[in-house]
Amino acid sequence: MLAVALLVLLCASASANSIQSRTSSYSGEYGGKGGKRFSHSGNQLDGPITAFRIRVNRYYIVGLQVRYGTVWSDYVGGTQGDLEEIFLHPGESVIQVSGKYKSYVKQMIFVTDKGRYLPFGKASGTSFNAVPLHPNTVLRFISGRSGSAIDSISLHWDTYPSHCNTC
């Protein structure tokens, strides 16, 4: 009798795990193979993405920094070029990232759930278009490779954090 009860409990647990919805997905890597790896995976614990600082020159994206909640990530990339900064509105999220690349990331265009279109860089190279695989998910963090420029970029998607009331 105990064996039957354990079997039923095990089957119920396996069934519950199999129907648990998935929310995270990954897009990338777009760009070249150079540079040193970086990841903002730990930064997502500070909150949702709330702003971008992106340095561009006339050829490609040189560097980037992302604000998670109220905390800026470490800057990655080079120092040459113009620094552009854009803040998201409270509760606004990135739901699509498209752009161009060759050996470096040349362009990134962030599209938000409020209909805003935020372009950085130059439109030349191979196109990419990154969207989450699962509904009701947003851009949570960025990873990639960088040196004197942003060599490649990857986008990581998941649900908007429920613990951030002021973001």
UniProtKB/Swiss-Prot annotation:
One Pfam family in the UniProt entry: Jacalin
Q: Which domain of life is it from?
A: Eukaryota
Please name the GO terms that the record assigns under molecular function: carbohydrate binding; peptidoglycan binding
Q: Look up the record and give one Gene Ontology term from the biological process aspect.
A: suppression of symbiont entry into host
* Compartments in which it is found: Secreted, Extracellular space, Extracellular matrix; Zymogen granule lumen; Golgi apparatus lumen
Query: Main localisation, per the record?
Result: secreted
This protein's GO cellular component annotations are:
collagen-containing extracellular matrix; Golgi lumen; mucus layer; zymogen granule membrane
The residues forming the signal peptide are 1-16
Going by the UniProt record, its keywords in alphabetical order are: Cytoplasmic vesicle, Extracellular matrix, Golgi apparatus, Lectin, Protein transport, Secreted, Signal, Transport
UniProt-listed CDD domains: Jacalin_ZG16_like
Give the InterPro entries listed for this entry: Jacalin-like_lectin_dom (IPR001229), Jacalin-like_lectin_dom_sf (IPR036404), PolyBind_ProtTraffic (IPR052321)
Domain Jacalin-type lectin: where? Answer: 24-159
Q: Which family does it belong to?
A: Belongs to the jacalin lectin family.
Which PANTHER family does this UniProt record tie to the protein?
OS11G0524900 PROTEIN, ZYMOGEN GRANULE MEMBRANE PROTEIN 16
Q: What does the function comment of this entry state?
A: May play a role in protein trafficking. May act as a linker molecule between the submembranous matrix on the luminal side of zymogen granule membrane (ZGM) and aggregated secretory proteins during granule formation in the TGN.
Q: What is this protein called?
A: Zymogen granule membrane protein 16
The species is Mus musculus
